Amino acid sequence: MGIIVKIFFLFLLTLDTEARPISYSGGHTVMHFNDNMKESIYYHYSPSFKYSVGVEKFDDKIFDRSDTNLRFTYLVNRKNTKNSQRNFYFQSAVSTKNKNYIYGVHGDWETRRYFIGFDYKEVKNIIDYKNKHIQLGFAPYLGTYGDLHTWLMLKTKKNSLRKKQITYPVIKFFKGNVLLELGYDKKTDWDIHL
């Protein structure tokens, strides 16, 4: 592995890189996504626990082009209880190269044992389309702080361009501030979130 790649991964590990739409006040997050629609690297800064601003560099696999988006995410509602947490976000992005933009909502509810999440986005592009997914999961064991945590999940995605709904298994690992999510479907290939 080249020295540049090693330095890049070392840089990622030294940041607070837990995959989340908004970090704590003053926090930074770096995420990498790869699926059948796009591959991207995304960085955001959270001046407040209520919102984040960021930049996403991506390769659009459908329209075979690269672009950079400026992103904004706002925490509309959060509810913490003794046993669970619920989040609801507004998300948006605008292209730095053209008039393309994205807006949508993202939400989740989880306990230490169960997880439910959803995402809905409208994409204004060369051809406008909608992305949506639902994710359900459970933790096969309960770890304590600092342990490696594992989630077994099912993800269902539908995209208005492809007009087919696909459902596939996902496994999610996280420890400390690092998260890795892997899913696979033979029709869409790998779905990776780091």
Where would I find each of the regions flagged by the language model?
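Transmembrane beta-strand segments that form the barrel wall of outer-membrane beta-barrel proteins
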Residues: 22-34, 51-60, 85-96, 114-124, ...
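Feature captures outer-membrane beta-barrel proteins of Gram-negative bacteria and organelles
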Residues: 38-48, 66-80, 101-113, 130-144, ...
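Short, charged/polar "capping" segments at the starts of alpha-helices
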Residues: 161-163
